[in-house]
Amino acid sequence: MLNLTLTFLVVALIAAFLGFSGIAASAAAIAKILFCIFIVCFILVWPNKTGLVPVQEYPGRSCLHL
């Protein structure tokens, strides 16, 4: 998602450099929205740094010993 944000930011900068102010404003607005969504997702995932922990059906046993 951060890649999309950076892509729209680059598009906005190029469009602004070439004089397309409407396209630059739209791309900058999209980049801003995507960045905010990215930050919210990052804050929600950050406390759980390790990600999802797999659940074992039979603790201490592997599938081969059933």
Curated annotation (Swiss-Prot):
Cross-referenced InterPro entries: DUF1328
Subcellular location: Cell membrane
Keywords, ordered alphabetically: Cell membrane, Membrane, Transmembrane, Transmembrane helix
Location, primary (coarse class): membrane
GO CC entries: plasma membrane
A Pfam family matched in the record: DUF1328
Record membrane topology: Multi-pass membrane protein
Bilayer-crossing regions: 4-24, 28-47
Recorded family membership: Belongs to the UPF0391 family.
Name under which the protein is recorded: UPF0391 membrane protein AM1_5042
Organism name: Acaryochloris marina (strain MBIC 11017)
